[in-house]
Amino acid sequence: MTTTYAVLSEGLEKNYGAVHALRGLDLAVAEGAVCGVLGPNGAGKTTAVRVLTTLTAPDGGSARVAGHDVVREAASVRAAIGVTGQNSSVDGELTGRQNLRLFAKLLRFRGEAARIRADELLERFELTDAADRPARTYSGGMHRRLDLAASLLTRPRVLFLDEPTTGLDPHSRNQIWAAVRELAGRGTTVLLTTQYLEEADQLADDIVLIDRGRTAHRGTPAELKALIGSYAEVVVPQASALIPAAAVLDQLTGAEPVLDHERRTVGAVATDTTLTLPRIVRELDAAGVPLIDASLRPPTLDEVFLRLTGRGDGRTSPPLKETAA
């Protein structure tokens, strides 16, 4: 069966003076899929969104969104997409209802159509009770939901979400996640950039890891986790046992261990698929390392990112580096 791509880029390049923001970025997002684009600050995520949404022209390569070239058919691309960026587009002095009606009129909704569509979206995003309050009185999560509602006024085929939950509390983040799941269930293609690896794990059908403007790896969450094997972690009773435990894990896994003094844990990615938990326990015992607990589990996306790019993110789990005592 032939796959139809809602977003397709090949060798995408973008420079800002001497800064190479995109260095041959390749993306392929199937229609109706949720694609998570991951990377640390400066990786090129926002630049990629700006190019794909026609806000800035590429310096090389090509890209098509909803079947249209982002350079030659920019107007057609804009008619087919919705965008929610990192910065709110909401006017704080207007009410939520007024904001949506204003956006609708700017999008050339006629007559009662603007009112009807605004009311539909206010209800859909649970903003009806606050619809007639100034948006400046909204919480961060409500602002984001109003932004998302505005991006859906035209029922876009493709929705771009650029770090939509950055700075939100867990409850507000879960509300945005629920909205994205609902959109995906209705067949909307979603390209989501995020620094929160748990977010991509929860929402994305496919994940693209971007590092320094290039596509580092891509695949489903399960496929990416399978690339690096399991994650071994041990808990020791005192800080003095961390270094000896790290030496054992280093020998067993061949990967640099991660020490967390506060939690008194040592962890390392185990690429050796034959490594077992009993062997880990035996080797620690043979080395005289006291032990409270040990585990061998599938890796998180944090650990995948660290292993595949050589640097961690640490936004949703303990930082992937040695922490201070």
Cite the ranges covered by each PLM segment.
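Conserved NTP-handling cores and scaffolds of large molecular machines
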Residues: 107, 228, 232, 253, ...
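Solvent-exposed beta-strand sheet faces enriched in polar/charged residues
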Residues: 10, 235, 260, 295-297
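ABC transporter nucleotide-binding domains
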Residues: 4-9, 14-212, 216-217
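Preference for bulky hydrophobic residues occupying beta-strand positions
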Residues: 14, 27, 234-236, 268, ...
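A short linear hydrophobic-aromatic micro-motif
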Residues: 127, 254-258, 290-295
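C-terminal coupling/interaction segments
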Residues: 272-325
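ABC transporter nucleotide-binding domain
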Residues: 177-271
